[in-house]
Amino acid sequence: MPDQNHLLAALDTVPDPLTGQGLAASGRASAVRLEGARADVIVDVAGLAPPDRKTLDAAVRAVLLAVPGVAEARVLLTAEKPSRRIVAIASGKGGVGKSTVAANIAVALARMGRKVGLVDADIYGPSQPRLFDAHDRPDAKDKIMFPVPTRWGVPILSMGQLIEPGKAIAWRGPMAAGALSQLVDAHWGDTELLILDLPPGTGDVQLTMIQKHRPVGAIIVSTPQDLALIDATRAIDLFFKADIPIIGLIENMSGYACPHCGEISDPFGQGGAETEAQALGLPFLGRIPLARAIRTASDAGTPPAFGDDADAQPFHAIARALDAWLNPSPSPVF
């Protein structure tokens, strides 16, 4: 079986484009580790042109996969002070499936070829490590963390990766807000878009996110029921007051199809989020059904959006709408 020394030796066969040294010797390759048959490495590509970064990425993957016993190679590229945008996924109320929606939007965007990462900003109730099956503790350099790669193409950082499972986080607001900043200000490499899974409510974490990290827009998740919509409206008002655009509303848990007879029922009501969006003059991004398959896949750490079946389609449609909002096509000139 290979060990870390085998990986380091392989990396040193790839020359640093700037110094000519091996990648491990030059310090360009770091956080080298072996998990079973999977090799992980972080490569600093600061100072390299995009074509050179791509070439280096391919070379690193090739030498790692050539090590006997290595079946998979995960390479995370990092660079200094990248330009990236942040989109907040929020709700006024807990239990509406916001984290599941955030995870699947990120995965759907990654499948579209977007360089996307996810920050689990729900400091007190982190769930993204479970949704992505990514429980590894993140590495750090100079007290700055590196996101944990996932097999779904979306690197993530979460407080759930830093504490023992089941342990409560008894922090006051300023400490939680500081933790959020550490997650956002991590070594995100060439990630162009960060999906921020916010905790429910309108407290210190949300205010820090708005004041310090300034998302380009926010998506509000709600169930159709009136109680959830009342709290969602409070979250919308917070973003309105901060002059942060609302990209749109999503209605989650919208309709339940009986697995035996196929009859559709609406345990949480029907159309409430769409009606609220119309009343507020906001875009409605779509409905996600209350489906057993989505729940079981999410609990197993397999985001449904990674597939192409019916359960994935609502997430793909929402991701396309978000991508169009972020990258609008130029209007034709007549």
Q: Where would I find each of the regions flagged by the language model?
A:
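Short edge beta-strands and adjacent turn/loop segments
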Residues: 17-42, 74-77
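Walker A/P-loop phosphate-binding motif and the immediately C-terminal alpha-helix
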Residues: 85-123, 236, 240
